[in-house]
């Protein structure tokens, strides 16, 4: 156990004095949040005091590990990649990570996507997949079958993390971003070894990268320099490259890959039906700013899966061509169609 674990008063006093906690301390606190033993006041005090001090990688890792220990397990037998952002970047953009997931799987790399309904936007991953006919709330065995059969599956956060309901009230009432906002990408129940992970919060992005490094994953942690929680096409993107337990920081520019700059308005989304239509047009081969953004993010996920190595730009350039081919061959459209049908069949069988 950590030095503070066992006493809320000691733990909160330590934080308020500006001192860091150990991973064991935050895991102890998170464990009580997940079991419902922590009162709403203690939940709120804990995450607000952490935010005021500034969360460390060890503190966030302790929370994420405790959350995973309470999740419903999902064993995927294949290496896979996750493509997900923290959300909350207020950009109101189309579902770029969702589209990139479909394209990456169509290019032959297994994807296990972790996500939820919209929090700050009009349309989250779950909302757009539901509008596309994908059964979003499959149990663990159903998600596993989807990945085995199709190379893609979606873990709906409320299905896999039911214990997080105890934090819902305090999260909503606090109304400011806290460590809870970055836990989603760190708690994919399939625990994929690779990821393209977006974080719009400039201070938290390198903290998240260090958590992934401590786990030994191969991850590109990205933040658009416009504040988007993905690789942006409106300007440059900062990339924290996580491989071999270390983190290095790079900057990439869409122009390096023959992609022109777009405006935020060109990536603007709407409700689930509007964004679903954008997905359909993307997989049908429509050119333009949305495709450009999807290609870069899909290439980033492939690079993370393959291991970015020492030449990130060279890797991304080759992968942009590979993911473009997955759209233009019709493979992405075919996969989306099969995913909707197969997930619905599996859902019926598991009812």
Swiss-Prot record:
Binding sites annotated in the UniProt record for anthranilate 2: 171
Protein's GO biological process: L-tryptophan biosynthetic process
Cofactor(s) the record lists: Mg(2+)
EC number: 2.4.2.18
Entry keyword set: Amino-acid biosynthesis, Aromatic amino acid biosynthesis, Glycosyltransferase, Magnesium, Metal-binding, Transferase, Tryptophan biosynthesis
InterPro entries linked: Anthranilate_Pribosyl_Tfrase, Glycosyl_Trfase_fam3, Glycosyl_Trfase_fam3_N_dom, Glycosyl_Trfase_fam3_N_dom_sf, Nuc_phospho_transferase
Gene Ontology molecular function: any one: magnesium ion binding
EC main group: transferase
Binding-site list for Mg(2+) 1: 97, 230
Binding, anthranilate 1: 85, 116
Binding site for Mg(2+) 2: 229-230
Pathway assigned in UniProt: Amino-acid biosynthesis; L-tryptophan biosynthesis; L-tryptophan from chorismate: step 2/5
GO cellular component: cytosol
Any Pfam family hit: Glycos_trans_3N
Domain of life: Bacteria
Binding site for 5-phospho-alpha-D-ribose 1-diphosphate: 85, 88-89, 93, 95-98, 113-121, 125
Purpose: Catalyzes the transfer of the phosphoribosyl group of 5-phosphorylribose-1-pyrophosphate (PRPP) to anthranilate to yield N-(5'-phosphoribosyl)-anthranilate (PRA).
Description of how the protein assembles with itself and partners: Homodimer.
Family of the protein in this entry: Belongs to the anthranilate phosphoribosyltransferase family.
Name listed for the protein in its UniProt record: Anthranilate phosphoribosyltransferase
Lineage: Bacteria, Bacillati, Actinomycetota, Actinomycetes, Pseudonocardiales
């Amino acid at each position: 156990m950590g030095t503070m674990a066992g006493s809320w008063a000691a733990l909160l006093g330590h934080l308020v004095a500006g001192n860091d906690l150990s991973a064991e301390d935050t895991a102890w606190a998170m464990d009580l949040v997940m079991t419902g033993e922590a009162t709403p006041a203690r939940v709120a005090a804990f995450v607000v005091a952490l935010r005021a001090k500034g969360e460390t990688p060890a503190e966030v890792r302790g929370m994420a590990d405790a959350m995973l220990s309470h999740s419903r397990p999902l064993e995927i037998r294949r290496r896979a990649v996750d493509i997900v952002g923290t959300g909350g970047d207020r950009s109101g953009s189309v579902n770029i990570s969702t589209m990139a997931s479909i394209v990456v799987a169509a290019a032959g790399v297994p994807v296990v996507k972790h996500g939820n309904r919209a929090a700050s936007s009009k349309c989250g991953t779950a909302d757009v997949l539901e509008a596309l006919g994908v059964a979003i709330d499959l149990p663990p065995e159903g998600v596993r079958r989807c990945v085995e059969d199709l190379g893609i599956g979606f873990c709906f956060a409320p299905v896999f993390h039911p214990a997080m309901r105890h934090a819902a009230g305090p999260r909503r009432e606090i109304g400011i971003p806290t460590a809870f906002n970055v836990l989603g990408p760190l708690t994919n129940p399939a625990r994929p070894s690779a990821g393209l992970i977006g974080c719009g919060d400039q201070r938290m992005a390198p903290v998240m990268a260090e958590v992934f490094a401590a786990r030994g994953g191969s991850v590109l942690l990205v933040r658009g320099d416009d504040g988007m929680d993905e690789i942006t096409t409106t300007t440059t993107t900062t990339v924290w490259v996580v491989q071999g337990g270390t983190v290095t920081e790079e900057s990439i520019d869409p122009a390096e890959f023959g992609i022109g700059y777009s405006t935020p308005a060109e990536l603007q989304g709407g409700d689930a039906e509007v964004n679903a239509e954008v997905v359909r047009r993307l997989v049908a081969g429509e050119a333009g700013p949305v495709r450009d953004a999807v290609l870069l993010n899909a290439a980033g996920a492939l690079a993370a899966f393959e291991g970015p190595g020492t030449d990130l730009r060279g890797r991304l350039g080759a992968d942009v061509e590979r993911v473009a081919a997955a759209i233009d061959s019709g493979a992405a459209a075919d996969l989306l169609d099969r995913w909707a049908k197969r997930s619905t069949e599996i859902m019926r069988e598991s009812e």
